[in-house]
């Protein structure tokens, strides 16, 4: 991986090619970083949302195959969206600043990346979760 964010060797740059991923994050800087890293891996970003209702509408319109989600969005949770995505067999990566025990027990088995995270950890997680699709 090159040092500059968003650039990868050719083999990693196509790793997620053709996948439509959803980003749900209410912190604008983190959302932009996630979008940049996902795009650099070759995925198409269906949308980046800070509200669950907007993300749910996108899931109804688009053929989303996976999602990177914060659990808490300005006082609301993304768990309704998580349930919809899981019902469609979409893999999910939680990106959260909360402690593991703050996640409801029936969602704790889902992959989680703690904020703050670095590019290497994010790419590794994305490969494991979305690379096998």
Predicted regions and their residues:
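Hydrophobic/aromatic residues positioned on beta-strands within the core alpha/beta folds
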Residues: 95-96
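Active-site residues of response regulator receiver
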Residues: 70
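A Lys-centered signature of the CheY-like receiver
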Residues: 115
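Non-catalytic signal-transmission and effector/linker regions of two-component phosphorelay proteins
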Residues: 1-20, 104, 118-133
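Acidic, metal-coordinating helix/loop segments flanking the phosphotransfer/catalytic sites
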Residues: 48-66
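Acidic catalytic/metal-coordinating carboxylates
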Residues: 77-80
